[in-house]
Amino acid sequence: MINKAYKAVVLAAVLFALLPWDAAQADDPDFISGGIGYFDWNRQKSPAAEFRAEYRSDYTLWVFKPFGGIMATSEGAFYAYAGLGIDVFLGNRFVITPSIAPGFYAEGGGLDLGYPLEFRSQLEIAYRFDDRSRLGVAISHMSNASIVDENPGTESAILYYSVPLSTLLGR
């Protein structure tokens, strides 16, 4: 089932990449993003508050943008990750961003996901303000993609606020 989910995410990313691109993306900056949400909301085996901090680059590799971040839960779990996302602009205001990121997961006192190497797939929908900052909601799935026998996986629901790095640096 997980392999089918990853194939669906990859297919969706390719289809998004083939969509016509809006000129709004040309001046899109790099971002510092903060997120707060609900970890393991689907299975409720170890539900917790989730906190994220990310750097989202303005550099593009074809249509992919690199990003990296850290996540921590109120139960002591920690995840450090880096990956690629695609910003799909729907006009000047709305952005859909599918992404995938491998990373290192430590359960702490939280949910045991079966292996330190975990993969996070995510779909975010955001509103883009005049200053290019974004307010978005995202659904994430995290699992080890069945590289070991134990692969419980989990989902998160996240509220993001992304600020252009230039705004934070006063440029």
Residue ranges with predicted function:
Residues 30-32, 60-65, 92-96, 131-137, ...:
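Repeated loop/turn-to-beta-strand initiation elements of outer-membrane beta-barrel proteins
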Residues 49, 152-171:
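Outer-membrane beta-barrel "beta-signal"
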Residues 31-40, 63-74, 96-106, 137-143:
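Transmembrane beta-strand segments that form the barrel wall of outer-membrane beta-barrel proteins
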Residues 96-124:
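Mid-chain, well-packed structural core segment of small domains
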Residues 1-28, 168-171:
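Cleavable N-terminal export/targeting peptides
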